[in-house]
Amino acid sequence: MAPKQKDDDFVLTLSDDENDAFNNFDVDGDDGDDGDELASSGTKKRKRDTAETTQNTSKKQKQQKPVKNGLKKNKKGQAETPAEEEQEEPQEEEDAGEDDGALDSDFEFDVGGVANTVVEGFDGWGMGNAEDEGAAKKGDKKAVDIDDIISRRQAKKEAAEAKKKKKQSEAQDNESWDGVAEDEDAESDGGMSVDFQDDELLAADGFGMGADGEDESDNEEAQDESGSDNDSDDDEEKDSEDDDDEAASDNDSVATPVGHPEDEASDNDSDAESEIDAEEQEKRKAFFAPEEEKTKEQADGAQRSFQEFNLSRPILRGLAAVNFTNPTPIQRKTIPVALLGKDIVGSAVTGSGKTAAFVVPILERLLFRPRKVPTSRVAILMPTRELAVQCYNVATKLATYTDITFCQLVGGFSLREQENILKKRPDVIIATPGRFIDHMRNSASFTVDTLEILVLDEADRMLEDGFADELNEILTTIPKSRQTMLFSATMTDTVDKLIRVGLNRPVRLMVDSKKNTSLTLVQEFVRLRPGREDKRLGYLLYLCKEIYTGRVIVFFRQKREAHRVRIVFGLLGLKAAELHGSMSQEQRIKSVENFRDGKVAFLLATDLASRGLDIKGVETVINYEAPQSHEIYLHRVGRTARAGRSGRACTIAAEPDRKVVKAAVKASKAQGAKVASRVVDPAVADQWAKKAADLEEEINEVLEEEKTEKQLAQAEMQVTKGENLIKHEAEIMSRPKRTWFESEKDKRAARKLGAAQLNGPDAGLSKKEKVKLSNKDKKRLDDARQRLEGKAGWKKGKAEREAPKPAKGKGKGKDKKKGKN
């Protein structure tokens, strides 16, 4: 009886049910009575097991009344499932009789079989998960909404205007009642003479009060003529000065045309770059793996589908779910090499699918990993938070039908939640360098000893001076025996830079490695003549109000300028969002989501958004001013015309931007891309610039109100922090202090180097640092200030010092003699 009691008490799990159902199938294909008896006995046993288990649970229901109803429902469900199985099993037995346990030889993977799960319009920003939404809502700072401030101010203005109109109407009513008396007074005063020469008695909008003198009207006509001349001059290309040379030769036949010094310097630089040093070629030959000769099938692009890479079915199903059917050139080259475990240095134009090029082989390799012990094996590093969030969304979509786990270590999100996820040892970690190092040094649950694959996306940016210290800290900590993959649209192949990453005979996979743009991109340039640089905002407002009215990204060099233009757009009724490093993570994600969903028409961003950001439907990119280098320009304009779609890029360029503009035009002409010059009427631009200038006072008031709200939010946060310190003092004090690998001084120096890479060496000169002055410097500054104020005393020169001095008391003696007489 004892063994029987054990069998009765045993509760089947889901896997046990599946094994029993599988064992009930007759593998030999006999549809005899034996199979029916086995099936019936199996179902009877399950009936008995479920009945006894429900009886055992019913005894406990008397003590647990709150969960009584739920258990009754489970009991009913358990009683109904065997009956359903009895009806379905005969059909399964008939199917199993014809199956020999192997797959049909004619079976093919049906890409269209997942048509119901295809994500239409997938762009990497589909944050539909509640987990992602909850993470996005947890910002470190309290957000201050500019739209709320502007709407409040406009509501106040409208209320004040309504009140003013009401008073005026009341005054007019009172005047109408007293009209008869006023007419009589006017008749009685008919013989009096009134002097109207006083300016205060005349209305400002009276007839003739706004008329200008003849000289002023002549000046305006002259300005209009010069404006039309400037308008006609804007038709010429950015890199040519032929019309100016012809005009100079007409005026002075002796003068010869002289090229612009910046043009000559850029020509010399391009010549120097084209002639690669023989020593550098030898270095590259020794550093990179030899390039394999292309077969005829590879040259013809024979691999037209992902199925020809021999990928696993869960990966193919995930690719079909996001509507990836045909591999791009960079994917065709990268996936076979990455599956072999080789190091890779890859480059391709923006929007060519570089993220999937390294995610797909990583997922394929992880499907064959040991599953007994969870281990973190892959680290993908990104330069910006938005790019890391986007890569995380793409990777999780591609791995939908696998058991591979992911974790994103991004600044701005909760450290505690990230530590809890790291305790589960996720397979793939997608991170920014700063937060990766933070967890590496301060989280006990995070170990990097098991990493097997390292990916650096936008690697040329990661190799710059701003990220050099952080990257070196990571590379010296993780294992050296790893696979390393570097990708970027402007990937460098200079050995001195790449050797720092610790690559082992990497394979160069350069697709469109000549720093080209997409062929579907139309590049436009608006030229600002010398002396009109202060009208730049007027040109931008005209373009956004009249020409490009929707799905536009506007790039700025500085956060301050982007924020100020954001306020101008709001005051002029243009729906815009901003994206830069001074915003909290909650605000940054909200801005991208609002722009992606079409709630705002313009995204005003710094170079934070220039790399990797993939938002579907971006029609236009406007450069408020040309960037520091041609590489940054390529990344900026690469936000549009992605994946074969068309797009436009418009750059407002002045004389300081000549070098970058010329490089862009030269590369585009060599590639065969379309380049055009857009002409904007200077008078129209001046009108918009005047509108922006008239809003200057209101802009400052909005900035002041925003500053006040931020200070209030900061004060509230400090109060909350103090309350938490008092309430949870023991827990907070018991936490170990977080450490960092460099001092504050080193961090400031790295920040300066990063700013210089983006905006040039003079980027930080406008903001002066506080330096303690010596007494000598103070005296020099005081003397200079006194001279400017005119208070400095007269100082004798050499001639005055050498002149004979008058005798002492000579004048006084004469006065004394006169007094005595």
Curated annotation (Swiss-Prot):
Q: Which family does it belong to?
A: Belongs to the DEAD box helicase family. DDX27/DRS1 subfamily.
This enzyme catalyses: ATP + H2O = ADP + phosphate + H(+)
Concerning Pfam families, the annotation shows: DEAD (PF00270), Helicase_C (PF00271)
InterPro entries assigned to the protein according to its UniProt record, in alphabetical order: DEAD/DEAH_box_helicase_dom (IPR011545), DEAD_box_RNA_helicase (IPR050079), Helicase_ATP-bd (IPR014001), Helicase_C-like (IPR001650), P-loop_NTPase (IPR027417), RNA-helicase_DEAD-box_CS (IPR000629), RNA_helicase_DEAD_Q_motif (IPR014014)
According to its UniProt record, the EC number is 3.6.4.13
Lineage start: Eukaryota, Fungi, Dikarya, Ascomycota, Pezizomycotina
Q: Its GO CC terms?
A: cytosol; nucleolus; preribosome, large subunit precursor
Q: What is this protein called?
A: ATP-dependent RNA helicase drs1
Keyword annotations of the record: ATP-binding, Helicase, Hydrolase, Nucleotide-binding, Nucleus, Ribosome biogenesis, RNA-binding
The region called Disordered is annotated at 1-304, 754-821
Localized where?
Answer: Nucleus, Nucleolus
